[in-house]
């Protein structure tokens, strides 16, 4: 416990380092070589640190990795991930890249002072979708002999929980035609999942009924018996602006989860 207290209260005294463009998946494919990179931001003089893996947004069709300012100097390791994008690849390849980046983190994070039992996954919009999919559909991490339930928590910001609209578009399905198939986090609700913190913007300002999707996800997780699902609606903030206040919730929930005794 003393390390955790040090981590969050003495962060201003800590020296941080950033290493950019580490390869997390090897491939002969030029596009994979370009996109399967991550940046890691870590405190040099702390150990046993929590880690946040951050997936950028952009509708699965655009965007680039960056370390969110609100996650810096907080005593945590932050890993920002690029992944291959639609329509150059399939939705399965996007998800496979996300899983590979998480697997890399499990393998490597202790070298940077991290604790494999304190790995959280988060991201905004498309990044939130990837967060929920990899954390709930266990097959993606199983490929690396990792149990998705060993993640400390999933914290998607305004993530789609039905099948992603860009994936639907590639299959000739309209943006406003709801679809729930194997590529929808909702399809994979389960009792034994990691802690799930759902955060959206104002229901009247969000994209495509994003709040209502997440509210249904929250309800279904509760109904299947998941005991640690939370839902937050950030009033007065739309899809993009909700990210800034959402980081406060992320920090508070990480502290809560880390200070909650593990069930035997």
Locate predicted features:
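N-terminal cap/lid segment of alpha/beta-hydrolase-fold proteins
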Residues: 12-46
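Short beta-strand element of the alpha/beta-hydrolase
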Residues: 48-57
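Active-site glycine-rich loops that stabilize anionic/oxyanionic intermediates
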Residues: 56-61, 160
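Short amphipathic alpha-helix adjacent to the substrate-entry channel of hydrolases
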Residues: 64-81
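Alpha/beta-hydrolase active-site loop
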Residues: 89-110
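Primarily recognizes the serine-hydrolase "nucleophile elbow" in alpha/beta-hydrolase
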Residues: 106-169, 180-181
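The feature captures the conserved acid-bearing segment of alpha/beta-hydrolase catalytic domains
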Residues: 145-153, 158-167, 176-215, 219, ...
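C-terminal catalytic histidine-bearing segment of alpha/beta-hydrolase fold enzymes
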Residues: 215, 222-264
């Amino acid at each position: 416990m003393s390390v955790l207290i040090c981590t969050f209260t003495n962060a201003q005294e800590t020296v941080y380092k950033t290493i950019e463009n580490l390869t997390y998946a090897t491939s002969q494919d030029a596009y994979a070589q370009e996109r399967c990179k991550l940046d890691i931001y870590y405190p040099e003089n702390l150990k046993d640190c929590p880690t946040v893996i951050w997936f950028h947004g952009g509708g699965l069709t655009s965007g680039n990795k960056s370390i969110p300012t609100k996650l810096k100097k907080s005593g945590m390791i932050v890993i920002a991930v690029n992944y291959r994008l639609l329509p150059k690849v399939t939705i399965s390849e996007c998800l496979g890249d996300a899983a590979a980046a998480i697997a890399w983190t499990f393998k490597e994070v202790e070298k940077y002072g991290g604790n494999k039992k304190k790995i959280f996954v988060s991201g905004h919009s498309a990044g939130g979708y990837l967060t929920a999919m990899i954390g709930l559909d266990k097959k993606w991490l199983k490929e690396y002999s990792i149990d998705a339930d060993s993640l400390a928590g999933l914290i998607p910001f305004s993530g789609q929980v039905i099948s992603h609209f860009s994936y639907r578009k590639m299959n000739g399905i309209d943006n406003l035609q709801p679809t729930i198939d194997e590529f929808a986090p909702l399809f994979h609700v389960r009792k034994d999942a990691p802690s799930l913190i759902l955060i959206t913007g104002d229901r009247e300002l969000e994209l495509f009924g994003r709040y209502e999707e997440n509210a249904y996800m929250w309800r279904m997780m509760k109904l299947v018996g998941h005991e640690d699902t939370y839902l937050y609606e950030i009033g007065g903030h739309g899809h993009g602006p909700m990210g800034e206040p959402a980081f406060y919730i992320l920090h508070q929930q990480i502290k809560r989860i880390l200070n909650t005794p593990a069930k035997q």
